[in-house]
Amino acid sequence: MNFGQALEAVKSGAKIYREGWNGKGQFVIKAGGYTVSESRPGSDYARAGIVGEFTIQPHLDLKNAQGHMQPGWVPSQGDLFAEDWLAEPVAE
């Protein structure tokens, strides 16, 4: 599938990845899109002085080959024009 189709899939809750990615086990998910009632004590938000209710806006996060989550993933030009995107449903 192309990136437009992959984007629609991830917006619907699937995890997406490219067949051609070298790092096996990598994938992208949609994260955020929810309201937090209060910052967790000790979190980066709390240390920045963010208090009260706030919204985490929807964004894309990458699980990289090392198993780390990288928030705010942005596709490369190659990713945008690739035709090797795949999607898998995730558990609810």
Label each PLM-derived region with a short phrase.
Residues Q57-E92:
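Short, compact, well-ordered microdomains
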